[in-house]
A protein has these predicted regions:
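Modules that initiate DNA replication and primer synthesis
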Residues: 1-3, 39-67
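Feature primarily recognizes SF3-like P-loop helicase cores of small DNA viruses
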Residues: 2-39, 65-457
């Protein structure tokens, strides 16, 4: 259709007869002039997803304002609804092998194509400049914030967030005591990711079933100050970290739908990300936990540091892209230092004291041909907690945790254990009791401190 097509006998667009606007014809002409599609509940252009429709409304208004029609704002809204139908495509899957930047498209193999002719899901506001200088201020900042062996992991994770993929199956938590400047990372990343990054709350994601829909089309979600409370449920967080393709999303007052989810989670915190009930290894295995260096007492903070690092955005992008290429070459397995592994293990132990209990002495003994009932096992565990001033898990949580980690301790959960009364009950093969807290008849009294009545004065 020709641009600004006119009617044969009037100097007017074909979609306006002098009194009324034909929305369908207007949208047909608009799409002929403008590269835009509507898919997965959003408009997309060569600039990426339309996050604010006000500029789009402004374009429509510029074409309508000469028309003497009533209630133009409502007419614009109607046109937008028709435009969704006219520009509709069935699906718009993410492209995991390329990064669309301000001045072109960069493939994972390093090939760069200048220009932006195609409609894309996301386009980063940073440009690709292979000759950009090294981000000296950024690198010096990281050197003072993190241990040297942990910086490659951060480099790979930021690079991982440049593409719409969850193949890495990891989220990142950067933990410190406060005042180290770790949140400056989020400020710098906002310059690189633009509207493809969102400030959010992992706590909200875990407890609000509508929060996941807010992360649709987003590359990175940053929790700048993660709450210290343990998560009551972890399934929403785990599903985001491991999403491969579409997942079920829900918005208030609307029917749930299948949407693309590839948001990566990055949190800054003064503590660990813990679960209130989830003792599974999977929850902790998905965390990359980085600890910051202690802040030097004589360090002078630069209030303009974030702005100085933002000026190095092109160099930081090259640095992150190098990390992405290394991650892809390693089949999306992150570089992990011994410290990161120890951090993850420490978080797991802090939230689940069965590991320390199983390594204790004087309470149980691991033995291949031995067995113990679940009830006796839990009573010994309770005694161990009492004598070490620790809060015990509930009986069901203890059993679930032991079952989940049975392979680690060479145990077998079965229902053919014979208890002291001669009845067959549930229990574990591969462990025997050393302490026997129930012999004195007092559940919470340690057998180590019990004194028989006939010994007392």
């Amino acid at each position: 259709m020709a641009k600004n097509r006119k009617t044969p006998n009037m100097n007017l667009p074909v979609w306006f007869d002098g009194q009324n606007i034909n929305e369908a014809l207007f949208c047909e002409e608009f799409l002929h002039e403008r590269r835009i599609i509507f898919a997965n509940g959003a408009f997309f252009t060569p600039d990426g997803r339309v996050t604010d429709d006000l500029p789009l409304r402004g374009e429509i208004y510029d074409k309508l304002k000469f028309c003497a029609v009533n209630n133009i704002p409502r007419k614009i809204t109607n046109i937008l609804e028709v435009l969704k139908l006219e520009a509709q495509v069935s699906d718009f899957p993410p492209e995991q092998d390329r990064i669309h930047v301000a001045n072109g498209t960069l493939l994972l193999n390093g090939t760069f194509t200048e220009g932006r002719p195609a409609i894309v899901r996301s386009r980063l506001p940073v440009g690709y400049n292979p000759d950009a200088p090294a981000p000296v201020i950024w690198l010096n900042f990281l050197d003072g914030l993190l241990y040297a062996e942990d910086i490659p992991t951060l480099q790979e994770f930021i690079g991982y967030c440049l593409i719409p993929s969850n193949k890495g199956q990891r989220m990142m938590v950067i933990k410190g005591n406060g005042g180290e400047g770790k949140s400056q990372i989020g400020a710098v990343l906002s310059t690189i990711f633009g509207t493809n990054m969102k400030d959010g709350s992992i706590g909200k994601i875990s407890e609000n079933r509508f929060a996941r829909a807010d992360l649709e089309h987003i590359l990175l979600c940053v929790d700048d100050d993660m709450r210290m409370e343990a998560l009551r449920q972890t399934n929403y967080v785990k599903s985001i970290v491991t999403a491969q393709g579409k997942m079920d999303l829900e918005r208030k007052g609307k029917q749930s739908y299948q949407g693309w989810m590839f948001a990566r989670l990055l949190a800054f915190s003064n503590g660990d990300l813990q679960a209130l009930y989830d003792r599974s290894d999977g929850f902790y295995r998905r965390q990359l936990v980085l600890t910051t260096k202690e802040k030097q007492v004589d360090r002078a903070d630069d209030p303009d540091l974030a702005e100085k690092m933002k000026a190095e955005a092109e160099g930081i992008f090259l640095w992150a892209f190098e990390g992405l290429q290394r991650l892809v070459a390693n089949n999306f397995k992150f570089t992990e230092s011994d410290r990161i592994r120890e951090n993850r293990e420490a978080v797991k132990r802090d939230n689940n004291n069965i590991f320390d209990f199983m390594e204790s002495e004087g309470y149980i003994r691991r033995k291949a041909d031995a067995s113990i009932s679940s009830k006796d096992f839990y009573e010994i565990y309770r005694m161990w907690c009492e004598e070490n001033s620790l809060a015990p898990l509930k009986a069901r949580s203890f059993s679930d945790a032991m079952i989940a980690n049975a392979g680690r301790f060479n145990l077998e959960h079965c229902n053919n254990i014979t208890n002291s009364a001669g009845r067959r009950v549930w229990g574990f093969m591969g462990v025997e009791a050393v302490a026997r807290p129930h012999i004195n008849g007092f559940y919470d009294v340690s057998s180590c401190t019990y004194v028989p009545e006939d010994w007392r004065d």
